[in-house]
Amino acid sequence: MSNTIILSGGYKKIQSLTINSSATLKPGMIAALNSSGELIAQATEGAACEKLVILEDALQGKTVNDTYTAGTVADAAVIFPGSEAQVLLAATEKVVVGDYVTGTGVGTFQKLEAAQVPLAVALEACDLTESDAVDTLVAVRFL
């Protein structure tokens, strides 16, 4: 696992966004901006959405393992097609190289199901089907 969310390619970094009072976000999650311009977890499972991913904030001493809580600030990036990044795959999911992934509706990613919109393709296999599995970063290429 790399120590950074962005692995290669292009992106538009958006700095110092406030986390909404009801949100807890981690690097690698898919996010959205609410009507107040605050970060929230992208809330619609399998839907088309802006590819806005929470980043680690190394300038504040944060890593890919840190959590951002309500009222704090975080950096995010709009990831361009063809770019590679690590995203947070939901516990209980299993992907292999080449599987399409999409949002779960709570900020993490899942393997694409029928009638959902793909956001990225898995670049590595990850099996989180064990009962004690936790959300885990996995490398993807954004579509």
Predicted feature residues:
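Surface-exposed, low-hydrophobicity beta-strand/loop segments enriched in small/polar/acidic residues
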Residues: 1-143
